[in-house]
A protein has these predicted regions:
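Preference for extracellular/luminal or secreted protein segments
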Residues: 1-209
Length: 209
């Protein structure tokens, strides 16, 4: 079912309770979750101390990813430090043409890596896959036992291609929508973070100059 929600507006003050309920129902029904139990079992009092690598098309503007977006704050509850990858920033790639080690992991830091991709259309056309070889990157992370989980927002083509690479031990999820509601519903099911700690808006890094 196509969603016609405004991804740039997370203010629900003009929605009635019935409209709000319908919105969340549509979002929830559109989600696809795989192997979420692994992530839930990983929830623990001690921070995971991992990397939340978020890929977006751009940040000027980026309405679906404000400083308080669920894609940033919910992983933060588990101890993930967010890092943004976007066209105007420094590339996270060491050598995109190297199928064994395309990601520059020395720039990202140590620990498990949660990969969230905000993509639209089919980036496997028009040589986009050469510039952003996420298939090879995921295999690189799997081989190093560093891939904590995969989330794809938007493109079903990317989800289909990347989720097929994952072993059953790695949690993954897909949402056709990219709005904050979709992030919230998806990550709550995938990560099951402890809702009790107060959230901070700090702790966001970017690949920028």
């Amino acid at each position: 079912i196509p969603l016609t929600l405004d991804s740039g507006n997370n203010d629900h003050s003009i929605e009635s309770a019935e409209e709000r309920s319908l919105t969340l129902e549509l979002v929830t029904q559109s989600l696809e979750i795989s192997n979420s139990s692994t992530a839930k079992e990983s929830t623990q009092p001690n921070p995971i101390d991992g990397i939340n690598l978020i890929r977006v098309d751009g940040v000027l503007p980026c309405p679906m990813l404000s400083a308080d977006a669920p894609a940033i704050l919910l992983p933060k509850r588990l101890g993930f430090q967010s890092v943004l990858s976007h066209p105007l920033g420094i590339s996270p790639w060491a050598d995109p043409s190297d199928p064994l080690a395309p990601l520059a992991l020395d720039r990202l830091g140590d620990g498990p890596l949660l990969l969230q991709l905000f993509v639209r259309g089919n980036p496997f056309q028009a040589n986009r896959s050469i510039r952003e070889p996420w298939t090879d990157a995921i295999q690189q992370l799997i081989d190093l036992n560093r891939l904590f989980g995969l989330v794809v927002y938007g493109s079903p083509y990317v989800w289909e291609a990347l989720s097929a690479l994952l072993p059953s031990s790695i949690p993954a999820a897909y949402s056709p929508g990219q709005m904050p509601d979709a992030q919230q519903q998806l990550l709550q099911r995938l990560l099951n973070p402890d809702p009790s700690p107060a959230l901070s808006r700090l702790g966001i890094n970017e690949f920028t100059d």
